[in-house]
Swiss-Prot record:
Organism the protein comes from: Homo sapiens
Main location (coarse class): endoplasmic reticulum
Annotated domain remarks: The thioredoxin domain lacks the 2 redox-active cysteines, suggesting that it lacks thioredoxin activity. The di-lysine motif confers endoplasmic reticulum localization for type I membrane proteins.
Membrane topology: Single-pass type I membrane protein
Gene this protein is translated from: TMX2
Annotated region described as Disordered, given as residue ranges: 269-296
Protein name, UniProt field: Thioredoxin-related transmembrane protein 2
Variant or mutagenesis effect after changing residue 205 to Q: In NEDMCMS; may affect splicing; decreased protein abundance; homozygous patient cells show decreased mitochondrial respiratory reserve capacity and compensatory increased glycolytic activity
Domain Thioredoxin span(s) in chain numbering: 114-269
Length: 296
């Protein structure tokens, strides 16, 4: 099953993969991941390359290169056992392929290894993964609007994602969170996001670490009555994040989304009979006045 699950996910997502490969980030990343394969197998690129094969064929893998590639395959399969989305599967393949390419190029020629590392650094500095721009029902907060919105109507339950655009885990979770917002958003249950990589004071206020080594991104916090009710991942006594998988099933189960949704629907119906002097639940919107998804 550890092997079949990633393969099934990839086959199921072939149409989406074709759209990804049309984007510069994924196209260039795929080329870098296959760089050694192209150099070693395609003439005239392979002509004149050193080889340890007994037949002296420079356009085929020697036994050590095969061992490295087999080890890469094993690592990718083990890492993909914990991957949830196709983006995570592809990201793991790209990352470990580049590591293997670096080793293979340095083993072939130190100059080729240095050139490959330089290309990877330039790629990382100039190309960023495309942000999720699909349908969603999410309100984007900034450092001022998040507290105002949470306090505006305390009958509204909020689920807020604290994210950073540079985090691969946040990028992988984006389509899952968007899909949840489309399924469960209603008058009394709203979904929000705030970029703590951009608004560092928000990360400090809500105790979400933005360190590059952190395991706290993304963080989901449930607010009820304007106060934090729970969060995932949890933080232990030493201030470290407890490992938690951000899958759609886990979010629905841990945050009791089905129950929250039914309760919010009942409250919204009862709200029709609320006297005028009581505050009325705010109308959900996709973005706030001060924040827009495209600004990121």
């Amino acid at each position: 099953m550890a092997v079949l699950a990633p393969l099934i996910a990839l086959v199921y997502s072939v149409p989406r993969l074709s759209r990804w490969l049309a984007q510069p980030y994924y196209l260039l990343s795929a080329l870098l991941s296959a760089a050694f394969l192209l150099v070693r197998k395609l003439p005239p690129l392979c002509h004149g390359l050193p080889t340890q094969r007994e037949d002296g064929n420079p356009c085929d893998f020697d036994w050590r290169e095969v061992e490295i590639l087999m080890f890469l395959s094993a690592i990718v399969m083990m890492k993909n056992r914990r991957s949830i989305t196709v983006e995570q599967h592809i990201g793991n393949i790209f990352m470990f392929s580049k590591v293997a390419n670096t080793i293979l190029f340095f083993r072939l020629d130190i100059r080729m290894g240095l050139l490959y590392i330089t290309l990877c650094i330039v790629f990382l500095m100039t190309c960023k993964p495309p942000l999720y721009m699909g349908p969603e029902y999410i309100k984007y907060f900034n450092d001022k609007t998040i507290d105002e919105e949470l306090e505006r109507d305390k009958r509204v339950t909020w689920i807020v994602e604290f994210f950073a655009n540079w985090s691969n885990d946040c990028q992988s979770f984006a389509p899952i969170y968007a899909d949840l917002s489309l399924k469960y958003n209603c008058t009394g249950l709203n979904f929000g996001k705030v970029d703590v990589g951009r608004y560092t004071d928000v990360s400090t206020r809500y105790k979400v670490s933005t360190s590059p080594l952190t395991k706290q991104l993304p963080t989901l916090i449930l607010f009820q009555g304007g106060k934090e009710a729970m969060r995932r991942p949890q933080i232990d006594k030493k201030g470290r994040a407890v490992s938690w998988t951000f899958s759609e099933e886990n979010v629905i189960r841990e945050f009791n989304l089905n129950e929250l949704y039914q309760r919010a629907k009942k409250l919204s119906k009862a709200g029709d009979n609320i006297p005028e002097e009581q505050p009325v639940a705010s109308t959900p919107t996709t973005v706030s006045d001060g924040e827009n998804k495209k600004d990121k």
